[in-house]
C-alpha cells in the first residue's frame, strides 16, 4: 500500500530533461520498457502535430512559434501521460513548463560539453555556412545547466556510460520504495 511519502506524484512515471545529446529519448525509451509503461518523446509529438520536423518548424515558423508548440505540448503530456516522457532540451526555458515540473519525477541526464558536442555530431568539421555550432552549444549549456539542475528530482551523469546502464540505474530509482518518492 502506498503512503504519502512513497506514492508517485500525479503525472508521468518519469520526465527526462537535459541538453541535446544527453540521451533523453534513448534512455527514456529503455526505462519505459523496463518499467512496462509507454514512452513519449515531446519533440516527436510536436512533429506529428505540425506535420514537419522540429528543424523545419524553427526555419519556417520561427523559434517563438516552436516554443509555443513546445510549451502547449509539454503541458498536455505532463498532465495526461502516465508513462515515461522525454522533453526537448529547451522545454525548461518556459516558466509554465517549469511550474508543471515542480514535484514531478524529473530526471536530469547530466552531460558534459565534450559528450554533448560528440553525441550531436558537432565535433565534425562544419562548413562556414553553419557558423560556430560548438560555441552555440557552449552558450546553450551555460544558460540551461542551472535550470536543469534546479528542476531535477534526480541527476544522473551520462558521460562515458552506456544507455542501458544508465536506464538500469534510473529504473531502480523508480521502483516502489522510499527512494522513489516524490521530489521533496
Residue ranges and their predicted role:
Residues 103-146:
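A glycine- and Lys/Arg-enriched "phosphate-lid" helix/loop adjacent to the NTP-binding pocket
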Residues 89-92, 112-114, 161:
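Short glycine-rich anion-binding loops that position phosphate/pyrophosphate groups of nucleotides
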Residues 2-9, 30, 34, 143-184:
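NTP-dependent small-molecule kinase module
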Residues 19:
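P-loop (Walker A) phosphate-binding loop of NTP-binding proteins
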Residues 16:
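Hydrophobic anchor at the beta1->P-loop junction of P-loop NTPases
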Residues 24:
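Conserved lysine of the Walker
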Residues 27:
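Hydrophobic positions on the alpha1 helix immediately C-terminal to the Walker A/P-loop
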Residues 41-100, 125-126, 134, 138:
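ATP-dependent small-molecule kinase phosphotransfer cores
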Amino acid at each position: 500500500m502506498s503512503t504519502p511519502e512513497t506514492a508517485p506524484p500525479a503525472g508521468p512515471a518519469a520526465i527526462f530533461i537535459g541538453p541535446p545529446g544527453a540521451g533523453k529519448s534513448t534512455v527514456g525509451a529503455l526505462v519505459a520498457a523496463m518499467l512496462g509503461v509507454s514512452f513519449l518523446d515531446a519533440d516527436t509529438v510536436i512533429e506529428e502535430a505540425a506535420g514537419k520536423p522540429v528543424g523545419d518548424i524553427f526555419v519556417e515558423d520561427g523559434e517563438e512559434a516552436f516554443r509555443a508548440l513546445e510549451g502547449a505540448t509539454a503541458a498536455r503530456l505532463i498532465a495526461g501521460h502516465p508513462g515515461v516522457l522525454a522533453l526537448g532540451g529547451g522545454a525548461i526555458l518556459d516558466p509554465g513548463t517549469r511550474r508543471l515540473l515542480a514535484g514531478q519525477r524529473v530526471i536530469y541526464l547530466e552531460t558534459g560539453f565534450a559528450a554533448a558536442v560528440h553525441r550531436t555530431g558537432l565535433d565534425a568539421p562544419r562548413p562556414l555556412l553553419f557558423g560556430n555550432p560548438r560555441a552555440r552549444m557552449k552558450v546553450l549549456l551555460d544558460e540551461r545547466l542551472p535550470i536543469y539542475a534546479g528542476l531535477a528530482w534526480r541527476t544522473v551523469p551520462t558521460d562515458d556510460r552506456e544507455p542501458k546502464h544508465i536506464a538500469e540505474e534510473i529504473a531502480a530509482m523508480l521502483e516502489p520504495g522510499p527512494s522513489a518518492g516524490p521530489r521533496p
